Amino acid sequence: LKEMFPGCIVTKNDANDIQGLPDLTIFYKDRWATLECKKSANEKKRPNQEYYVDRMNEMSFSRFICPENKEEVLNELQQAFES
């Protein structure tokens, strides 16, 4: 992420703070996004994860990301940050 978006700030969110909040928040220029990282597309979602990903996607950009969709999600993130 730091190579794709020079100067961005990436924070790892504390799962104990708000249950279901996405794992990463990325701040880039005047934009932000969140990513919920999964080891695979089949990994089980925890309580509230879908709610927060959907809600934050309405506000800005948020996705579940895993090895199977990594390239697609990063391309979408790049488009969101450039729009």
Residue ranges and their predicted role:
Residues 1-83:
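Catalytic phosphate/metal-binding cores of nucleic-acid and nucleotide-processing enzymes, i.e., regions
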